[in-house]
């Protein structure tokens, strides 16, 4: 099917990062749709307007179920462009592992991007190794939840951290929106520590592209370049002036990058 601009219509599936939800794509979604594409933005479990609480989800697989259910419902023969942001890269990878035949390419935006050799925990730990050792968490809070038998740790980003490390190139109104809508997050560290490497036949068989945000202060820019060089992609882009939230601070540039990737490899 052709889109409004005469080009082949694509179906983009947008996967948000930790603490966020489908709402964070509110600028990008209509831009892609105005080019004639179909766009689906999902809420992962305990995110956005998903009704479940964080203490009701124990594993990364459970957290990713809305994405997996969406992928399962895609008719045979149809393919999507899967777009994962930040921590959403892990959920994206899980979908690639289970439904490689339904994904034409996976695009990682300032995101963790595993390979088909090392376990996910390897890349989870690398994020912290690449981060500044003396980084000030500012008003970010660590909260305990769960039971004495199964203690869990949640992270709640504070307004100062968001405005200076995550949304620093966004407007005050956009930062306020995030403050109002962001939910506590779990990084599922215990679950990730037990997970095996993704397979070459599943995850590894899907084409990958990467978009680097060159003014990112929360997901190390150097690590983003390292992932491109060491994990490997068939296409990479750099968005100049983009903070971690490129879909909000640089939506037009992000749309252009996604369009170029789709045109080239799909």
From Swiss-Prot:
Domain of life from the UniProt record: Eukaryota
Catalytic activity: 17-dehydropreakuammicine + H2O = norfluorocurarine + methanol + CO2
InterPro entries, sorted: AB_hydrolase_1, AB_hydrolase_fold, MES/HNL
Protein name stated in the entry: Norfluorocurarine synthase 1
SUPFAM superfamilies, per the entry: alpha/beta-Hydrolases (SSF53474)
BP term (GO), one: jasmonic acid metabolic process
Gene: NS1
Key words, A-Z: Alkaloid metabolism, Hydrolase, Serine esterase
Assembly and binders: Homodimer.
Family: Belongs to the AB hydrolase superfamily.
Residue positions of the active site: 86, 216, 244
GO molecular function: hydrolase activity; methyl indole-3-acetate esterase activity; methyl jasmonate esterase activity; methyl salicylate esterase activity
Database matches in Pfam families: Abhydrolase_6
């Amino acid at each position: 099917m052709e889109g409004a601009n005469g080009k082949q219509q694509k179906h983009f599936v947008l996967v948000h990062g930790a603490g966020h939800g489908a709402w964070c794509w509110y600028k990008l979604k209509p831009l892609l749709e105005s080019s004639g594409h179909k766009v689906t933005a999902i809420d992962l479990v305990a995110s956005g307007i998903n009704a479940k609480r964080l203490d009701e989800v124990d594993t990364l697989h459970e957290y990713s179920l809305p994405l997996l259910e969406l992928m399962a419902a895609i008719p045979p023969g149809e393919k999507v462009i899967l777009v994962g942001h930040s921590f959403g890269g892990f959920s994206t990878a899980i979908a690639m592992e289970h439904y490689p035949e339904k994904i034409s390419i996976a695009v990682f935006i300032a995101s963790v991007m595993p390979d088909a050799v090392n376990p996910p925990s390897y890349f989870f730990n690398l994020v912290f190794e690449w981060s500044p050792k003396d980084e000030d968490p500012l008003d970010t809070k660590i909260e305990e939840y769960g039971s004495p038998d199964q203690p869990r740790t949640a992270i709640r980003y504070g307004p100062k951290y968001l405005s200076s490390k995550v949304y620093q190139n966004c407007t005050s109104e956009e930062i306020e929106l995030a403050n109002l809508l962001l939910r506590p997050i779990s990084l599922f560290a215990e679950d990730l520590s037990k997970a095996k490497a993704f397979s070459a036949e599943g995850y590894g068989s899907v084409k990958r592209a990467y978009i680097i945000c060159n003014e990112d202060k929360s997901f190390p820019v150097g690590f983003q370049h390292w992932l491109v060089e060491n994990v490997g992609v068939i296409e990479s882009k750099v968005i100049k002036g983009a903070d971690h939230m490129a879909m909000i601070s640089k939506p037009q540039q992000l749309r252009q990058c996604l369009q170029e990737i789709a045109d080239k490899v799909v």
